[in-house]
């Protein structure tokens, strides 16, 4: 029961102009991390290095903001990283490019964070996608310690799946840019070690 299968440290990509504006996006090629984002990733990389624990593998979403962040981490740890398409952000469909405030005004009768955007991905389907890819990653890295560089929403989904929190409540979990979240996966359960950690 207490035999650990895998330990995953999720790193949220560094700040972007969209993230700072609370703007929904699932574009792969824009926006890049900004100056603040680069600084955040360097700080979290230093935190990882100081812990001195071996990282067996680094994975990343293929989105530009994530691969830029992963490259900084991989260079410092002197490792390569692998992109996985299923680690991309939720497909926001017609909401893509809008801020949370703009959508709240447009759809005042909807729970923007939980509802399914037109031509987009339902929150439960999104969480299942993340659960499925994490199960696949874990099966390939048994007894390993890995890093996944991805989006806040992906990390929220991972936490919800690990702790069996309903998908529609995942927006209540705050994940800061450039932060680390760690989950230990066991045979029949998972443990959230820490969430949204940002080095002082």
Model region roles, listed by residue range:
Residues 42-49, 127, 131-139, 159:
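Generic structural signal for well-ordered alpha-helical scaffold segments
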Residues 16, 154-155:
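Short active-site segment of divalent metal-dependent hydrolases/proteases
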Residues 6, 11-79:
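Active-site-proximal alpha-helix that buttresses catalytic centers in soluble enzyme cores
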Residues 1-7, 50-51, 79-83, 90-101, ...:
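Acidic, low-complexity terminal tails and accessory targeting/binding regions
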Residues 151:
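Short basic (Lys/Arg) and small-residue
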Residues 72, 157, 161:
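Active-site signature of alpha/beta-hydrolase-fold catalytic machinery across serine-
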Residues 32, 75-132, 194:
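Phosphate-handling substructures
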């Amino acid at each position: 029961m207490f035999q650990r299968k895998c330990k995953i440290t999720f790193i949220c990509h560094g700040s972007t102009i969209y993230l700072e504006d609370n703007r929904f996006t699932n574009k792969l090629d824009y926006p890049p991390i900004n100056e603040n984002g680069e600084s955040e990733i360097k700080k979290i990389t230093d935190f990882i290095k100081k812990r001195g624990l071996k990282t067996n593998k680094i994975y990343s979403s293929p989105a530009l903001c994530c691969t830029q962040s992963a490259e900084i981490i991989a260079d410092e740890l002197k490792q390569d990283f692998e992109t996985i398409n299923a680690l991309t952000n939720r497909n926001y469909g017609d909401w893509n490019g809008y801020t949370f405030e703009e959508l709240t005004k447009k759809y005042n009768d909807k729970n923007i964070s939980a509802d399914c955007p037109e031509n987009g991905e339902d929150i439960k389907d999104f969480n299942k996608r993340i659960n499925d890819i994490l199960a696949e990653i874990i099966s390939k890295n048994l007894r390993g310690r890995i890093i996944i560089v991805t989006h806040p929403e992906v990390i929220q989904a991972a936490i919800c799946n690990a702790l069996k929190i309903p998908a529609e409540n995942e927006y209540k979990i705050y994940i800061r840019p450039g932060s680390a979240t760690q989950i230990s996966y066991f045979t029949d359960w998972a443990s959230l070690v820490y969430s949204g950690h940002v080095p002082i």
